[in-house]
Amino acid sequence: MTTLGTPYSPHATKVMLLGSGELGKEVLIALQRLGVETIAVDRYENAPGQQVAHHARTITMSDPAQLKALIEAEKPDLVVPEIEAIATPMLEELEAAGVVTVIPTARAARLTMDREGIRRLAAETLGLATSPYRFCDSQQELQAAIDGTDGQPAIGFPCVVKPVMSSSGKGQSKLDGPDDVAKAWDYAMAGGRVSHGRVIVEGFIDFDYEITQLTVRAKGADGQVQTHFCDPIGHIQQSGDYVESWQPHPMHPAALQKSRDIAKAVTDDLGGLGLFGVELFVKGEQVWFSEVSPRPHDTGLVTLATQWQSEFELHARAILGLPVDASLRNPGASAVIYGGQDAEGLVFDGVDEALAVPGTDLRLFGKPESFVKRRMGVALARAQDVEQARTNAKLAAGKVKPRKP
């Protein structure tokens, strides 16, 4: 039996989120609906999740001393990483000492904090199909990996270069020829977060489409961990950042089964409880592993319109040891609303027109500062079929006009 407490009481169930952006905000809301006392942590004040949490804390989460001091002061029952740029060795230390439980595990947080740990796990430990890849510490090493002059098979062109640690496509670029190498290296160095000076270069896979397979590890009625799969989510990315997603994405049954087999292999190894976003490339019946996030995924925002329990509710329930329902309610789609400018305190025109589009909803994230390509909101649409939902979501998103006041 799972027992939950009352916020602000001595018996409160306390959950701390490390990272409080738009995804964390929805997780916090889902936790609060279950009576959980929430602590939203971020690197800047008034982050979206901090606006709705019981407590807001601002620290440098990649600083081990600051992270340790905060966890020891707040004494949460669970620590839930929502971003990559965290001092994960400190989380491992605190978890090993029995100070706190990390979701899904501190090891999973460390392995997925950058592209190297999880790629080596998937390809080298689990033997899963991935694109050909190499890790490089200099522009010279990058050039050698592409050319094959490092004694290994050439990655060749086209290829994709990404910082070992970055998010939302920052620092990622596609290279079509030798003239792109220097630009790609410089762009990756500018876009990386913590592990400066190291990139992954991947051979380009000629895939038909890419999906996110949301995978949930949750306790069943017998107390044992069970794996649940949401319907596959299709999405379109531009420069590594999602701009549109929809659910369900039609797949060949064999490809769907392979996708779920891969997702289960990775999430079983990472362990713990919670929702994972497993990214996969698909061509016909072939499936390649790309990446995994041990937390709700940005493309999964569509589940706010499509599932009985959104990815955020699934995550909240799973980490609390509660049963989950990952089934689809109806087809739907999401479309991103960008800030379109560098400014603080934007206002949004056209909200009424957007919500007049049939079957639509909006999430405006409340980010205090906008950039040209910063995701400031998302339009959601549900419909009888995916194509209509995609049309309506894009139409609604286009009617929202962010501007300076």
Curated annotation (Swiss-Prot):
Keyword entries, A-Z: ATP-binding, Ligase, Magnesium, Metal-binding, Nucleotide-binding, Purine biosynthesis
Pathway in which this enzyme or protein is active: Purine metabolism; IMP biosynthesis via de novo pathway; N(2)-formyl-N(1)-(5-phospho-D-ribosyl)glycinamide from N(1)-(5-phospho-D-ribosyl)glycinamide (formate route): step 1/1
GO CC, alphabetical: cytosol
Keyword Nucleotide-binding found: yes
Residues reported in the UniProt entry to bind Mg(2+): E279, E291
Function: Involved in the de novo purine biosynthesis. Catalyzes the transfer of formate to 5-phospho-ribosyl-glycinamide (GAR), producing 5-phospho-ribosyl-N-formylglycinamide (FGAR). Formate is provided by PurU via hydrolysis of 10-formyl-tetrahydrofolate.
Protein name: Formate-dependent phosphoribosylglycinamide formyltransferase
Organismal lineage: Bacteria, Pseudomonadati, Pseudomonadota, Betaproteobacteria, Burkholderiales
